[in-house]
Amino acid sequence: MGSASKEYEFLSEIGLSSSHNLGNYVGGKWLGNGPLVSTLNPANNQVLPIAQVVEASLEDYEIGLKACEEAAKTWMQVPAPKRGDIVRQIGDALRSKLDYLGRLLSLEMGKILAEGIGEVQEVIDMCDFAVGLSRQLNGSVIPSERPNHMMLEMWNPLGIVGVITAFNFPCAVLGWNACIALVCGNCVVWKGAPTTPLITIAMTKLVAEVLEKNHLPGAIFTAMCGGAEIGEAIAKDTRIPLVSFTGSSKVGLTVQQTVSARSGKTLLELSGNNAIIVMDDADIQLAARSVLFAAVGTAGQRCTTCRRLLLHESVYDKVLEQLLTSYKQVKIGDPLEKGTLLGPLHTPESKKNFEKGIEVIKSQGGKVLTGGKAVEGEGNFVEPTIIEISSDAAVVKEELFAPVLYALKFKTFEEAVAINNSVPQGLSSSIFTRSPDNIFKWIGPMGSDCGIVNVNIPTNGAEIGGAFGGEKATGGGREAGSDSWKQYMRRSTW
């Protein structure tokens, strides 16, 4: 590696080259005929020493899809439990490189090391979950009106599933989709985020090794690094019946319209504008710790980040007092350093958006209680921020992808629910209360309108056993557990 820092030497352990890396695994081969790009370390905005990647061209894409079409004919005929065993082996391969992959994720994306390792572990957990699922893709026997007859319902693979992931969870979202899609008998075409190509390559190399070891077509799992051109090709491609997209509501709507125009299906995981409600009977210390974790973690770049804190008027001052004390103790710094709680935003543009967002907030009557500034020096660091503002302010309805928390006051449970439901997005929500009456109202038809409705836990940290996703402008998709697998298959009744 020459003069490269020793802290980067681990990258060779996960198959990354010291010169340039081909960023596309198509037809069982690594190639690249697109642009040569470099990835930045968000902690200092310097080009990583081995971070040059050759992205996909449209010609590479076409080679990959033709090979994927052929591989689908083989993969869908492999018995589901055997497909599950292949996914088990993928999980084992990831497990063997867990620390290296987690470190790379932190280095390239910017989240702290514990979160980087935890995200890769989530993919491993999804592999384990999918193994069990591979023996439970059950159909139904349905009574028939005809004498001596019955109806059978069974599930068949779609063929190819496109997965377009975002920078903030470059591994986990792949796991939620690909592990399920594979055991359901589908080939996967993955386009990782253009700003996290190294983790895309490293993950794919491990999957490719498993397929090769089992003498299976490499095109069962096709991966490409690239930008909007490749994403648009996936959305338009009639050979891909289902496209899973994670990103902003604006881009997601475009993907949905493009796929729908060809009568394809979409699975959308889009913007979140998540609220935590703290009632007058809540455990204040528990609530304050949870809010800190939900609002500051991943530098506010989770889709499930808590962005709105709804405080009952009787506990408003007490909760804010605890939070303001905790916020001042948050260590901002290199995500790979021990003790860091808040790493950088992912890109310099994100840092600029934070600064612009604070100005908009102030113009709409927002009062900065703590933070509100970018940190001077290298890297994309900003201060964790709490804003006192009216729930009627237009900016509260929007998602600022940064560690910015709006503090809002309410008087009654009904008012809190109304504020929670007043935004276009509907991903995650949580209430802190000891009242069974409030809890059952909260999770019922007159409560939260979000896909995730938590009680006495943060808005983030959804478990893989349940279906992950949201309503309204969040897209309506469901990934990971429960019966999400049905989206990756077609139902046949006979």
From Swiss-Prot:
Entry EC no(s): 1.2.1.3
InterPro entries according to UniProt: Ald_DH/histidinol_DH, Ald_DH_C, Ald_DH_CS_GLU, Ald_DH_N, Aldehyde_DH_dom, ALDH7A1-like
Catalytic activity, reaction form: an aldehyde + NAD(+) + H2O = a carboxylate + NADH + 2 H(+)
Organism superkingdom: Eukaryota
Keyword terms of this UniProt record: NAD, Oxidoreductase, Stress response
Example of a GO MF term: aldehyde dehydrogenase (NAD+) activity
Site (Transition state stabilizer): 168
Classification via Gene3D superfamilies: Aldehyde Dehydrogenase, Chain A, domain 1, Aldehyde Dehydrogenase, Chain A, domain 2
Binding-site residues, NAD(+): 247-252
Induction per the UniProt record: By water stress, low temperature, heat shock, high salt and abscisic acid.
Keyword Nucleotidyltransferase: no
Family as reported in the entry's similarity comment: Belongs to the aldehyde dehydrogenase family.
Assembly, per entry: Homotetramer.
Record's protein name: Aldehyde dehydrogenase family 7 member A1
UniProt source species: Brassica napus
Lineage: Eukaryota, Viridiplantae, Streptophyta, Embryophyta, Tracheophyta
